[in-house]
């Protein structure tokens, strides 16, 4: 698992602000709206645990939004932010018990899909931990796929 760095900019609401979430697919920009403002978010940067903000990445968010939104930036940027997403080398989450480490379970490596996969991940782990038959085959997600031997 390695960090994938995603960026966002949160703005105060302009007079003409988005009212619904938007995905600007051609520019890979997501817009999250609420009453007092909106957020532009996206990008994936593999830079280890570098804690700096990349101005080029932030500018790309604003350029992408400018192509689609009447007012692509609010009157004031409240926050310019990054967060690390757990990325798995094979782009498949790691879910299940860790071989040779009794009681240690993993649920990581979801990348940009963490929130969307959270309910399914929770259900799969709950089923495995309690001995219930899971609704899906857990083998593709097993930490054992990385075991040497």
Residue ranges of model-derived segments:
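Active-site substrate-recognition segment that forms the wall
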Residues: 1-102
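C-terminal lid/capping helical subdomain adjacent to the catalytic/cofactor pocket in oxidative enzymes
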Residues: 94, 98-149
């Amino acid at each position: 698992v390695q960090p994938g760095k995603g960026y966002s900019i949160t703005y105060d609401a302009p007079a003409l602000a988005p009212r619904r979430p938007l995905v600007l697919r051609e520019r890979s920009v997501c817009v999250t709206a609420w009453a007092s403002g909106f957020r532009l978010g996206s990008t994936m940067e593999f830079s280890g645990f570098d804690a700096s903000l990349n101005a080029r990445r932030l500018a790309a968010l604003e350029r992408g939004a400018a192509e689609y939104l009447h007012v692509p930036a609010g009157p004031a940027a409240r926050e310019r932010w990054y967060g690390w997403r757990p990325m798995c080398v094979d782009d498949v989450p790691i879910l299940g018990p860790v071989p040779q480490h009794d009681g240690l379970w993993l649920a990581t490596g979801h990348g940009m899909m963490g929130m969307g996969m959270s309910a399914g991940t929770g259900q799969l782990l709950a089923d495995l931990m309690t001995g219930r038959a899971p609704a899906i085959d857990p083998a593709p997600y097993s930490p054992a796929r990385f075991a040497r031997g």
